[in-house]
Swiss-Prot record:
Pathway: Carbohydrate biosynthesis; D-glycero-D-manno-heptose 7-phosphate biosynthesis; D-glycero-alpha-D-manno-heptose 7-phosphate and D-glycero-beta-D-manno-heptose 7-phosphate from sedoheptulose 7-phosphate: step 1/1. It catalyses: 2 D-sedoheptulose 7-phosphate = D-glycero-alpha-D-manno-heptose 7-phosphate + D-glycero-beta-D-manno-heptose 7-phosphate. Substrate binds at residues 66-68, 79, 110-111, 136-138, 141, 189. Gene3D superfamilies: Glucose-6-phosphate isomerase like protein, domain 1. GO terms for biological process: carbohydrate metabolic process; D-glycero-D-manno-heptose 7-phosphate biosynthetic process. Belongs to the SIS family. GmhA subfamily. The gene is gmhA. GO terms for molecular function: carbohydrate derivative binding; D-sedoheptulose 7-phosphate isomerase activity; zinc ion binding. GO terms for cellular component: cytoplasm. This is Phosphoheptose isomerase.
Length: 214
C-alpha cells in the first residue's frame, strides 16, 4: 500500500519514503547540472559561438541521437526552426534532426544497417561548413560516432553531448561535454536538454536578437 502524505497546517510534518525519492532525485539533478555548468561554461559558450557563426555564414545545424536523445535532438531543432521563447522575435534558424524521418530511418536500417543511417542522411543534407551535433548518454552510440566521423572528414564541425566517461565519441568531436553520471540515462538527458536550451539562448543573443527572459 502506498503511504499517504502526512501534512500539517505548517506544511509537511515528515516526509514519506516517496517524498524522499522526489527530493533526492531533484536535488541530485540540480547538483549535477551545477557541476556541469561550472566545469563547462566556456565550452558551452564556444558551442553557441560555433553554431551562431555557422548560421551567419549560411550553414545549418544537423542533430541526431537515439531513444531519449533522439527526442532531445528533435526538441532542440524545433526550438531553433520555430521558436524558443515568445519574448524573442527572430527568423527561423536552419536546424534538422536527422532522426526525425522514420521512413528514412527504417529504410536505412533495413537496407544499409542502422549504424550508418545518420551518416547517410548527413551525406544528403550536410555541406562543408555545417555543424553536426550528436547526443549519446553513454558516448558509445555507433550511429552517432559514424556521423561525426563522416562530418569531420567532409569539412563540417562537430559537437558531442555525452555521459559517463564520454565513450568513443568524446574525442571525435571538435567540442564536447561529458556529463559525469553513469548507470542510467535519465539524469544525463536532463543535463543535455538544459545545455541545449542555454546554447539556443546564447545563439539568439550572439545573432543580435533580444535577450530571452529567464
Amino acid at each position: 500500500m502506498i503511504p499517504k502524505c502526512r501534512c500539517s497546517a505548517g506544511g509537511l510534518a515528515d516526509r514519506t519514503p516517496y517524498e524522499e525519492v522526489v527530493l533526492d532525485t531533484m536535488l541530485y539533478s540540480a547538483r549535477l547540472k551545477e557541476n556541469v555548468a561550472r566545469q563547462n561554461s566556456a565550452v558551452i559558450v564556444a558551442m553557441a559561438r560555433l553554431i551562431a557563426s555557422t548560421f551567419e555564414d549560411g550553414g545549418k545545424l544537423l542533430l541526431c541521437g537515439n531513444g531519449g536523445s533522439a527526442a532531445d535532438a528533435q526538441h532542440l531543432a524545433t526550438e531553433l526552426t520555430i521558436r524558443y521563447r515568445s519574448s524573442v522575435e527572430r527568423p527561423a534558424l536552419p536546424a534538422i534532426a536527422l532522426n526525425a524521418d522514420t521512413t528514412a530511418l527504417t529504410a536505412g536500417a533495413n537496407d544499409l544497417g542502422y549504424d550508418v543511417v545518420f551518416r547517410r542522411l548527413a551525406e544528403a543534407y550536410g555541406r562543408e561548413g555545417d555543424v553536426v551535433l550528436g547526443l549519446s548518454t553513454s558516448g558509445n552510440s555507433r550511429s552517432v560516432f559514424n556521423v561525426l566521423q563522416y562530418a569531420r572528414g567532409h569539412g563540417m564541425k562537430t559537437i558531442a553531448l555525452t555521459g559517463g566517461d564520454g565513450g568513443i565519441i568524446k574525442d571525435l568531436a571538435d567540442l564536447s561535454i561529458v556529463v559525469p553520471h553513469s548507470g542510467s540515462a535519465d539524469r544525463v538527458q536532463e543535463c543535455h536538454i538544459t545545455i541545449g536550451h542555454v546554447i539556443i539562448d546564447l545563439v539568439e543573443r550572439l545573432l543580435g536578437y533580444s535577450p530571452s527572459r529567464k
